[in-house]
Amino acid sequence: MEIFKEEEEEAFSAIEGIIYACEVYDPVPRHLHKSKTKIINAAKLIIETHLSYYTILNNISDIQAYLSTWLRDLGTTGSYQTILSESISLMFDRTVSIFRKCTIEGGFPHLIARLYLRLKSYQKLLSDAGLKIFFSSYDYAFGAAYNLVNCSEYRYDEVHYISNGTYSLVASMKIDPAEVIKREHFRLTIPKFNISNILIEIFHLLDGLAFFKVNPDSLSISTASAETIFHSISEGNHQVLELGRSLMFPLLKTGDFEICRIDDAGAVITFTEAKDVKLEIISLDEVSWVMQWKSCLQNYERKAANDSSFIKTHLQFKKANNFNEDNNGLGLIVDRNIPTDDFMLASTNRQSPPPSNTGCSLHRSKPLHIPLSSVIREDFYDSSLNERISKDGDSSCESFSGAESILSDYDFHDNEFFNNQSPHYFSEHIDNNSREVVITDENTIISLENTQVSRWSNYSWQKISPHQLQVSIIQLRMGNFIVAYNSDHNLHQFKIRLCDDIKCIQSTEQDIQIRVPLGAIMCSVTGILNIRTKDADKLLRVLSFYTTDHTEAVSHSNNQDATASPLSSVSSAMDLKHSLQKCSSTIMPQELTQDVIGSKSDLISNIRQKI
């Protein structure tokens, strides 16, 4: 009896863990709120009942009498059944997979498994007919939900392109299940990559074959029993809940593979571009293999043989017309014959020497010798410009035509903010001739270290980086940007151009949520971002300032009385200057708030001088 009571205490600990897991896994999709609430209420009812009748239950010395009192007299059976039944909706929801992640022992699947096996032991000890009926219906619902997700979820994050000596990850187009002609399970072995006897499913499509790895590595029919799966989870086999299929290679079309051997049990095929990589496939259904799949592979081989004459003709044409795969930018080799002396003398003064073969691709125009921001800064702080602004606020954009004319001759598409040729994007020390963006004290409005950034994806918050990031708001000639990067590894995570289309709120004391619309310009990420930092209040003030339309504030400042207080004059001047910041080419003001840039007295004196 003592051992039984110790096991009961462990079961109650699992129930408390279920409550905690449901409260931690938040937010969840709206359609799961009802199931999650039912589980929490049922679990709390069990805990409260146990605490209320603890003295009575503790004095019972017989297991049968204890279970009869606990389950029947106190009516806790229904609460146990509610937790298990509603857990199916959470674990096998197709929109969110967080409730079936069992990488740690205290995860939600582990806790449900412990509760299931405990209630199963109650049923065996009591020989309860009601519990037996419940487990029969529960196993059926569990198996149906398991098979539905396992057969309809497809992943494309582990697609490998195989060529000579390489096994690299590549992007792949998604497979439309509606275009599948037939699908069948096989066992696959690839000796080259130490892959042995894994379960796969081959899809026959209109334009090729798709090889999908079955993630649980077992057939759904044999593993869909709830008791079998929960026993596997309790023994540490987490793969049983890695549901779905993962595409292994890009779609194999005619000419991409060759058949080395084929018989009544399976086949051995190899890739056209990697002869040493052999795929040994063995069918699990001999009748289906002989009647369908064997002829299917043979038809692909015959079609490839019929196309071989075209391939030979293509190679002859390529050789005859000087095609060269090493030529960059052109389909044909550039004729590099040296021109005659007469031609060189006639063209020396009006054209440069002919480019080399490696210089045929497009190139950038010659950069400016001085930063464009310095030119804009001079115009921005021009005293005559400020005089015109103070006289007529409605003509602020017209008064800034000097800076606009400077930008009009500059190549807008030459954007160093999205320059992909820069391996060290946020390098602090950089060559003067480089066109990379540099984050310095001069162009940084605010910089926060040790921040955690997450993105709302697939109905859950996903961290965009495992490391603590540095978040900065910087000024560039294209506008004002918020960027997140890893200062230790020189890796940027995202950059967002701040405008009034972007909304930001403070959800908690240390969390700022930013909503970036899909049509936002010059933003490397869209959707909802969450920035967690101890300086959330300071960050929110700066973000709110640069994501608010100040057009009305400018009009209001122009109509203010000349005898207004000094503080209101400063405020209106800042609003007036910010109307210029909305132009994408301007530099944001150095004076923003006392916490960010400088003292209040310096701010007031600077703005008074400009006005």
From Swiss-Prot:
Species classification: Eukaryota, Fungi, Dikarya, Ascomycota, Saccharomycotina
Protein name: UPF0508 protein SCY_3114
Domain of life: Eukaryota
Family the entry assigns: Belongs to the UPF0508 family.
